[in-house]
């Protein structure tokens, strides 16, 4: 009864903390229908009231024009996807172009000249309006990396400005609402510094989805969690760190959405007896029955796995993992999603992004908690103004909630990144080719060189706890509040920070290290980082 009352109190506090609804942006992939059996899903199976924005992934590009990736998209999936708005008039739909398998070469070619970009912009407006989408999402992974030249960091900004201006002009001419413009961006500080001018992206985009997952996986030599909320000493990668980093670079927090994964990353343990966080590992665990991708399990596959596995809770990172024999998976559940929703509210971010609805237990057949249990958790905590009829997840917060944030000085990134940098593809995108999307052809994308810093394995005696708060170390009492110590790549220790309920959080006031005299061509003008405009001839 005590925990139930605490849950109700937390839910009320979350819903009324800032008096404003948050965005819940949910992706749906166009290869989800080709998964076998009960893992197959079509747009008609989605709940139109679950998310504030639905994003269809992905469109493709041909001859500098946006095009459907598959003929079935235009004939079946687009109409079904946008027909959901007939049931929920407030729902917004966007079409995403790009993705990991898309690569960078077509983006680079399109960005290289004004005429190529103009051709792309015109095709975008035509395709979106023809099929009834409300906006465009750019999933360019990543400007200036993976074979993309360094200049793409700036030509990408040109494209954003030209898209935004064209959307405004089209809205004025047609008297229709302006098309939305968003982008998915990396949550890795090393990639962020190479790929983006964060402050300009913050000015030009309606919202930004931070890919704060795939932070650890089977490409590493020790186990690590896919999407931890907080950082560990010596390992700054976390959702909180990624969000705070983007904010520190000058992006308005209300435009930043935390990416939450509905899947887990797996490892094959070197020894079954050493199964803690930081244990030695050699490659991925077995592929899932439905997703068929090594090192990866959809949430509905995780639910099947944990029924026969041992579960643990990482106190310092507010996320669970499970293991059975030599198989290990770090994943998110309704409890960890709840903690992340609390962090989003406390830090006044714009909301959450979910990758993807088709990896959640969308029919409720596997996890026993109803359809879309993870997305429903976020909907209840971030979107709805009143209690939903959907059963609430069972988890509990202490009155002291911890926050990890960037220190007063931005860390200096010294690690050199090359265009050959190997970065893991986003979760679930394991399609072998553009034209063959059946599950039988799905393979794991080659990873090449790892982008993650070398991690120091944690001691095998590290304390862990089950989700109910019971520690696994002998003789220890359940923890209700854990201090936070986050260490930046520059060695800056941050924390511990304890936020009490009702305490006001002041965003970092120091501006990021943006060059003072570098000018960025923008339309017919050059925009300096401080916002001043000067006339300059354009590319």
Swiss-Prot record:
Functional summary from the UniProt entry: Binds to oocyte zona pellucida in vivo. May play a role in the fertilization process and/or early embryonic development.
Low complexity bias: start-end ranges: 440-457
Organism: Ovis aries (Sheep)
One Gene Ontology term, aspect cellular component: extracellular region
Localization in the cell: Cytoplasmic vesicle, Secretory vesicle
Name of the protein: Oviduct-specific glycoprotein
Keyword Translocase in record: no
Annotated tissue distribution: Oviduct.
Segments of this protein annotated with the region Disordered: 433-480, 503-539
Presence of the UniProt keyword Signal in the record: yes
Primary location class: cytoplasm
Gene3D superfamilies: 3.10.50.10, Glycosidases
PANTHER family: CHITINASE, OVIDUCT-SPECIFIC GLYCOPROTEIN
Gene Ontology biological process terms in this record: carbohydrate metabolic process; chitin catabolic process; single fertilization
Glycosylation positions in this chain: 402
